[in-house]
A protein has these predicted regions:
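Pocket-forming structural segment of enzyme catalytic cores
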Residues: 1-73
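Beta-strand-turn-beta hairpins that frame and shape the catalytic cleft
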Residues: 48, 82-86
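Active-site-proximal beta-strand elements of phosphoester/diester hydrolases
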Residues: 51-52, 87-91
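Residue-level recognition of conserved beta-strand positions in structured domain cores
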Residues: 71, 83, 90-91
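Short, surface-exposed beta-strand/loop micro-motifs that present aromatic residues
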Residues: 75-82
Length: 115
């Protein structure tokens, strides 16, 4: 694969023992890395924003330095990863209203700058 790691199904219960609904459907906050070195797109995004999810699995990247966004659902998981010319998210930006548009605008600007 392009990024090393695993993917696992969300457990039935979170770290606090509360039952998790799987699939995870709904809005959750993403905490973006504030390190400029993490990825150039992040400069255009607020430190935190809410995005829409529909998923039953979460990524477990081997290299934690690739994690640029984190969400909490039964515990923290990688919401976004980036490495060189790769930027991937676990949520649906196209369904995430204003936050999704900000992300897609930042992505388009970043891609245009790579020419």
């Amino acid at each position: 694969g392009l990024l090393r790691g695993r993917v696992e199904r969300f457990p039935d219960h979170g770290a606090d023992g509360k039952r998790l609904l799987v699939p995870h459907i709904g809005w959750n906050e993403v905490r973006w890395s504030q390190s400029a070195a993490a990825h150039p797109m992040l400069a255009a995004l607020p430190e935190r924003d809410h995005y829409y999810y529909v998923h039953s699995y979460r990524p477990l990247p081997r290299d934690l330095a690739t994690v640029v966004g984190v969400t909490e659902y039964g515990g923290d998981f990688a919401a976004a990863v980036a490495k060189q010319n790769i930027f991937a998210v676990q949520f649906h930006p196209e369904k995430s209203q204003a936050a999704g548009k900000r992300l897609l605008d930042a992505f388009a600007t970043w891609v245009a700058s790579c020419r």
